[in-house]
Amino acid sequence: MTKTTMHWLAHFQIILLCIWLMCPPSSQAIKCDTCGKECASACGTKHFRTCCFNYLRKRSDPDALRQSSNRRLIDFILLQGRALFTQELRERRHNGTLMDLGLNTYYP
């Protein structure tokens, strides 16, 4: 092997090692029964996050957030922010403070 080939091979191995170290082990993933029996059937789907969010919100237990991984905690926070934003939009539409113009205004 040439010196250049060995150099690139070493870089490639270092990159693979970094990728392997960055991948979280499966033991850190949230378990299907963490969010109650009603969410277990939705495990592995997009609906599971929503179900889990609602379950944790109902429980209002601070320890429930500590049990989830950091990634799930970020998801929880983003879902909570989205829910508050959606609720605010709904209230603005209900109060008439948000103009909801349909496409019919522009395309008769």
Swiss-Prot record:
State where the protein is found.
Secreted
What cellular component terms from Gene Ontology apply here? extracellular space
Q: What is this protein called?
A: Trissin
Chief subcellular site? secreted
Q: Name one GO molecular function term.
A: G protein-coupled receptor binding
Renumbered to this chain, the signal peptide range is 1-29
Disulfide pairs here are: C32-C43, C35-C52, C39-C51
Biological processes, Gene Ontology terms: G protein-coupled receptor signaling pathway
Recite the UniProt keywords alphabetically.
Cleavage on pair of basic residues, Disulfide bond, Secreted, Signal
Residues cleaved off as propeptide: 57-108
According to its UniProt entry, what is the function of this protein? Activates the G-protein coupled receptor TrissinR in vitro, leading to increased intracellular calcium ion levels.
